[in-house]
Amino acid sequence: MNPVQQPAQHRSPASLLHLPHPKRAQEAPDMGLYCDNFMFSQQNLHPSQRAPNFSIGGEFTPPANPYLWLGGPGMNNAPNYSPAPAPYIPSAFSAPQRHFMANSAAFGGADLGWMSAASQEELLKMVRPPYSYSALIAMAIQNASDKRLTLSQIYQYVAENFPFYKKSKAGWQNSIRHNLSLNDCFKKMPRDENDPGKGNYWTLDSNCEKMFDNGNFRRKRKPKSESNNAKIAKRDEDHLNPKGKESPPMITPSSSPEVLSPTGHSKSPSPPTVTYTPCLTNFIGSMTAVDSATMNRQSPLGLLNELSQRNITGLSSFISGSAVDQSSEHQDNSLFYNRSPYYTNQKQPHFLQQLHPQQPPLYQGRY
């Protein structure tokens, strides 16, 4: 038989040592102290006595306060863990409770009643506020009655409302001065003659009020909404000058001028003017005379005669036109680009060399 199922009278004394002993009514319940919420957790309570919404893996909602857990639940919201609205700690084990510290407006209404005043001061000295120096300056100026403060007054506001900056004044005070000088949102105002004191006043520019969202400084300004008059003027301008009927842009002069047609399209540039030297002109003239003498012979093919006639005619007209007016810019482009090539006897194709086998070289005997 299993020793666990044995009756109580048959169990050995050694097994009784490992069984939990029932607690007396006069004994205090087990209590554990946790650092995360600083509350007492009773270990011997029956599960039915707990609220249905209590669970270890329950849904956690982070506090809105930027100071970490400072906006978390305190001892005053403990009725969620007890069936009655009575205080969380039972009356039988209650001790003289501490006085709850009033919530400070500078820390977003944090519930710090479960801590002593000395502990709160030490905690806030270690936690740095999640605000930039520009935001701290803007908060100080906006909370002033006349919306202006001196440099020493800004120091005083930051030190009084944020204990973190009390321990080291040299570092953050230099940062405050640099932000006042470099940020355009802060304007310097000279003191009046009747106002005794030292130092100028600093105020916040009215155009930069929208640059601070929830105490944080925005690097870029918010776009301003256009006025109704500006919208109407822009609409009329778009109606008068639609995008599809815009005037063509003016033509800028280029390094290579082009001739424009009446329709506005540019033509291709004219061919370059060929300048002939006297020696080259005499050479071409002698070649033309030789070919003219060759054409007087009888050719068996009419196609060769026609081709030779076209070559001589085109070459003669080109030489005469260039000699009369070498700087003319309006000569026919078809004559320049579509002229048939001219072949000498030394560079004729194979089928032309068979037709003139007995023609001697052009410069034979001169060298």
UniProtKB/Swiss-Prot annotation:
GO terms for molecular function: DNA binding; DNA-binding transcription factor activity, RNA polymerase II-specific; RNA polymerase II cis-regulatory region sequence-specific DNA binding; sequence-specific DNA binding. Coiled coil: none annotated. One of its GO terms (cellular component) is nucleus. Residues 252-274 have a biased composition (Polar residues). Residues 128-222 bind DNA. GO terms for biological process: anatomical structure morphogenesis; cell differentiation; determination of ventral identity; ectoderm development; nervous system development; positive regulation of DNA-templated transcription; regulation of transcription by RNA polymerase II. Induction: Induced by Bmp-signaling. Suppressed by Wnt-signaling. This is Forkhead box protein I1-B. It comes from Xenopus laevis.
